Amino acid sequence: MSATDLDPEPDPESSKGQIRQANELLILQAAEKVFARAGFGGATMAAIATASGLPKANVHYYFGSKEVLYRQVLAQILSDWLAPTRCITVDAEPRLAIEQYIRAKMALAKLRPDGSKVFANELLHGAPVVKALLQTDLRDLVASKAAVIQSWVNAGRMARVNGTHLFFTIWAATQTYADFDVQVCAVLGNSSLSLEDHDEATEHVVSLVLRGCGL
């Protein structure tokens, strides 16, 4: 008996699950791009299907409607934005934690600019889809992380800053490189942001925020 004789037979259901996950990811990535360029109103399931390279029927099969897909895209963007806050804990070194968070946000601005634009456009229209998430998940997380920052302030580990407004400042400073990249490029005289431009911007934001925090 060979070793391969002992290998379990491939599970068809497992394979189907992997295919579904791969297709859903393709569709979500395509939808992010289409929503960023056309907005919710201008986007169509046909355009998303074309961008994903999958039949339109598949897009409807996995997500049902444009509204469902849009909600899923927004929820995923918010989840990805909140994940980097894990480094902000009471026992963490304030300078390292804040720097790590800023660098993560700048990386997202570079790697997922379309996601940032979709979210910004949603907010500019009054957040009709994500308002509940903003008032619950986001508000609760910011409150808990602002409490961590306040504990650092109370312990004399950093300058006296308002933790909640610190997050607003970081979001504005990092997301501008995605949401307003056209403006940034125009002022810099470039057709697009180069790796050097992004690195310089990252170091600038890190330095500015850390100095403002007395770190």
Briefly describe each language-model feature range:
Residues 1-11, 107, 111, 139, ...:
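C-terminal peripheral helix-coil segments that are non-catalytic and often amphipathic
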Residues 86-117, 163-170, 199-202:
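Hydrophobic alpha-helical connector segments
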Residues 22, 26, 34-68, 72:
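Helix-turn-helix
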Residues 71-100, 142, 148-150:
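Amphipathic alpha-helical linker/stalk segments
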Residues 23, 66, 73, 77, ...:
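Hydrophobic/aromatic residues within well-ordered alpha-helical segments
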Residues 110-132, 180-188:
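Amphipathic alpha-helical segments used for helix-helix packing
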Residues 1-22, 29:
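N-terminal intrinsically disordered/low-complexity leader segments
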